[in-house]
Amino acid sequence: MARMIPEFSRHIDKAPPFRKTGNPELDRGRQTEKELYIFLRDLLPDNWVVRYSFEFTRRTDELIEHEADFVVVIPRCGVLVLEVKASESYGLRNGVWYFDPECRHVREGNPFSQARATRFELKRKIQDYMHKSFPGLFGSIVVFPNARRIPGENAAPSSQDPDIIMTGYDLVRDVRNRSLARHLEHTLTLFGDHDLVEIRRSAFNQKEMDAVVRFLEDNYTLEPYRAFTDTYYSHLLDQLTQEQIRLLSSL
């Protein structure tokens, strides 16, 4: 069982990210992510770490906000970002993505471009935190839990590799065969020079993994600070004193 961040072991349906809202589209997405959360938690090894819904900002010329649906930290390997798409069907025609295979309802953005952008920005953010180049492998995969490839058609768009796509059919097979960890690790090994994969894997030792996990834990604490309130009352007293001086001066 993998370590999940955050951890929702009890009453997962009542956890804020998974509560029903009454919005069918939003609730379908929440339900899908909850199901994937449980599969990742229950089927990945104990020494794997999964961060769910990691929101972060990174500043270049401006401050940009990003969110990684799932970040899987794989020991002796690296980090794999999962971009999850909850819709039941997708179509791609002439470079435009649609929500339906008949290609009538346009959706915003290319899911592979989104996964790649999140991967690049998260890698840079972690490197900023570690103050060095990322030591292991760093990859991304697009997950369509509620859809599958149409039999007899291409396994992937001609612009993409089939191994960076995971459909509901793939997930069901991995759940039944207990092969989810092997599948994700294989995908991550594709993101690197073939001759350097083993070197990069060995460089991602326990110390480096612990540093990445600390980053993903995102711990932060603020302590009590009374000076603000004290300054407020001091300000009121000063204002009152000034008012009294003005009144006395007018007598």
Each predicted region: which residue ranges?
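Hydrophobic residues on short alpha-helical segments
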Residues: 248-249
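Intrinsically disordered, low-complexity Ser/Thr/Pro/Gly-rich regulatory segments
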Residues: 1-239, 245
